[in-house]
Amino acid sequence: LDASKCADCGACKNACPANAIAAVGKDLSIDTGKCIFCGDCATVCKMNAITFSQEYRLANMTREKLIVRSGEIYEPERPTNREFLRFCSKSLKIRQISAGGCAACELDFNVLGTLAWDMGRFGIQVVASPRHADCILVTGPVSRNMLLALKKGYDAAPHPVWVIACGACAISGGLYQDSEETMGGIEEILKPDLYV
């Protein structure tokens, strides 16, 4: 985000389907916890104040770190929590719970087990039951119909269990954040330990 190039026209904010852009004058910020990375904001910005990089490390331990402000260079957060580092140092058993999503994040997660990415080589394995899981990876905006299933899945896991919010929908509700049929993400239900 380059505030010096911003014409303060509001086109980027109006083009954003996820309401991820905040603008106070020429000071811009993008909430990557809401952003679906469609690129519409960059396309409509005639001044090129918004551009997307090739940075793929988008995970953070806190929700606030997902907000990128003009003039800041995005730097991925390094995990410093000793318990988290110890937790991830051996093997990791993940139970993925789809809480009413469109399947986009589920597909992205599933591809991590293929030959090209092979998360198993790092000791990461998807398990069929939350009873065998070290962490719960949640995708989707948490529809009202999936709320009970999500809570039961979390409760069934041996504690302490880590919670990963994967994708804009799980983090903030994404495109469905204003829907009465969703909970607007998992933060009000389960506190995520990691945001992806």
Please state what every model-predicted region is.
Residues A42-S129, E181:
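Flanking helices and flexible, charged tails adjoining ferredoxin-like Fe-S electron-transfer domains
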Residues L107-F109, T114-W117, R121-V196:
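Cofactor-cradling patches in redox/metallo enzymes
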Residues S4, G33, T139-P141:
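Structural motif
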Residues G10-A59:
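Iron-sulfur cluster-binding cysteine motifs and their immediate structural context
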Residues L1-D8:
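Extended, small-residue-rich solenoid/repeat segments and analogous flexible loops
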Residues D8, C12, P76, T80, ...:
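General structural feature for long, well-ordered alpha-helical segments within catalytic domains
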Residues L1, I94-Q96, V163, Y195:
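Conserved beta-strand scaffold positions in the cores of enzyme catalytic domains, especially
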